[in-house]
Amino acid sequence: MLFLQTARHSPESCPTHNYEAKKVFGTFTAKMESLTKKHGIKVVGSWVSMPEHLVVTVCDAPNQEAMLNYMMEPEIMAWSGYQVAETRPVLTLEEAAKFAK
C-alpha cells in the first residue's frame, strides 16, 4: 500500500538554521531506517525542495495500521513538532486506471 507524505516547515524551524530542529532532525534521520524496518515499511523515495521548505516522501507499507504505528514513534512525533505533514494513501496510475474501465 503506497502512501504519499508531504511535509512543510517554516524557515524559522528549518533544520539548516534552527539548532533545536537540527538535533531532532538528526535523531529522526538516524533512526528512520530501523523504524521503517520495524514496521515493514519501505521508503520508495524522498525529495526536498529547499526553497519551499517542503519534503515529499513515498512509502510502501503493508497496511494503514503499519503506517500509523510508524508515524506514532517518538522520533517521528518529535520531528512532527517542527513541521506540518499530510499523509494519504495513493494508487499508481496503472492501479487507478483499472477503476476507469
Regions found by a protein language model. Give the residues of each.
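Short S/T/G/P-rich N-terminal loop/turn motif that feeds into the first structured element of a domain
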Residues: M1-H53, P62-N69, V90-K101
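Short, conserved catalytic or adaptor-binding loops enriched in Gly and charged residues
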Residues: S34-T36, M77-S80
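Conserved RNP beta-strands of RNA recognition motif
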Residues: T57
